[in-house]
Amino acid sequence: MGKFQVISHPLIQHKLSILRREDTSTKDFRELVNEIAMLMGYEVSRDLPLEEVEIQTPITKTVQKQLSGKKLAIVPILRAGIGMVDGFLSLVPAAKVGHIGMYRDEETLEPVEYLVKLPEDIDQRQIFVVDPMLATGGSAILAVDSLKKRGAANIKFVCLVAAPEGVKKLQDAHPDIDIYTASLDEKLNENGYIVPGLGDAGDRLFGTK
């Protein structure tokens, strides 16, 4: 069973509380998503493997540690997931970036996939699927389905806020993946939005309705 973890770092929680505010501007919202993603990227990458290498400092030769060549991929669920990409890339700039595009049918609340663009060697990579919200779980499940169909096996899902309903659905559908969030919120409302949540992350990121 994959693990579920709420990352409760004080800086993350402080920034998340500002992110949730109705009066937070588009500019500030975008910057906060980026900052929280970077802080979460630090936490979720703790188990990346290291190897020892010999290097030359200005003083002497020494054996130090570096990432052991593990290939990484960041896969945002469009469109809101785009807001989290740069935060991760600031930590691992050599990572490849894939894209999975979805929109939510407003009547059925089910996700509809319209784009899958991934690195050719996605099956060899440690994948971080990023989306600010894990609400009903439908988009996350469909994204992981798409990745697994292409041979991906090492997948982590990273979000800013999650509803219990979405967490359970994702765990039931894909019990092998790890799920990380900055907050496990109360519930979903009748419209499928997280309560208290932060509104529509895509609209708030891009200033649209």
Swiss-Prot record:
<keyword id="KW-0328">Glycosyltransferase</keyword>
<dbReference type="InterPro" id="IPR029057">
    <property type="entry name" value="PRTase-like"/>
</dbReference>
<protein>
    <recommendedName>
        <fullName>Uracil phosphoribosyltransferase</fullName>
        <ecNumber>2.4.2.9</ecNumber>
    </recommendedName>
</protein>
<keyword id="KW-0342">GTP-binding</keyword>
<comment type="similarity">
    <text>Belongs to the UPRTase family.</text>
</comment>
<keyword id="KW-0547">Nucleotide-binding</keyword>
<feature type="binding site">
    <location>
        <position position="200"/>
    </location>
    <ligand>
        <name>5-phospho-alpha-D-ribose 1-diphosphate</name>
    </ligand>
</feature>
<dbReference type="GO" id="GO:0006223">
    <property type="term" value="P:uracil salvage"/>
</dbReference>
<comment type="function">
    <text>Catalyzes the conversion of uracil and 5-phospho-alpha-D-ribose 1-diphosphate (PRPP) to UMP and diphosphate.</text>
</comment>
<dbReference type="GO" id="GO:0004845">
    <property type="term" value="F:uracil phosphoribosyltransferase activity"/>
</dbReference>
<dbReference type="InterPro" id="IPR050054">
    <property type="entry name" value="UPRTase/APRTase"/>
</dbReference>
<dbReference type="GO" id="GO:0005525">
    <property type="term" value="F:GTP binding"/>
</dbReference>
<feature type="binding site">
    <location>
        <position position="79"/>
    </location>
    <ligand>
        <name>5-phospho-alpha-D-ribose 1-diphosphate</name>
    </ligand>
</feature>
<feature type="binding site">
    <location>
        <begin position="199"/>
        <end position="201"/>
    </location>
    <ligand>
        <name>uracil</name>
    </ligand>
</feature>
<keyword id="KW-0808">Transferase</keyword>
<feature type="binding site">
    <location>
        <position position="104"/>
    </location>
    <ligand>
        <name>5-phospho-alpha-D-ribose 1-diphosphate</name>
    </ligand>
</feature>
<comment type="pathway">
    <text>Pyrimidine metabolism; UMP biosynthesis via salvage pathway; UMP from uracil: step 1/1.</text>
</comment>
<dbReference type="InterPro" id="IPR005765">
    <property type="entry name" value="Ura_phspho_trans"/>
</dbReference>
<feature type="binding site">
    <location>
        <position position="194"/>
    </location>
    <ligand>
        <name>uracil</name>
    </ligand>
</feature>
<dbReference type="InterPro" id="IPR000836">
    <property type="entry name" value="PRibTrfase_dom"/>
</dbReference>
<dbReference type="InterPro" id="IPR034332">
    <property type="entry name" value="Upp_B"/>
</dbReference>
<dbReference type="GO" id="GO:0044206">
    <property type="term" value="P:UMP salvage"/>
</dbReference>
<keyword id="KW-0021">Allosteric enzyme</keyword>
<dbReference type="GO" id="GO:0000287">
    <property type="term" value="F:magnesium ion binding"/>
</dbReference>
<feature type="binding site">
    <location>
        <begin position="131"/>
        <end position="139"/>
    </location>
    <ligand>
        <name>5-phospho-alpha-D-ribose 1-diphosphate</name>
    </ligand>
</feature>
<keyword id="KW-0460">Magnesium</keyword>
<dbReference type="Pfam" id="PF14681">
    <property type="entry name" value="UPRTase"/>
</dbReference>
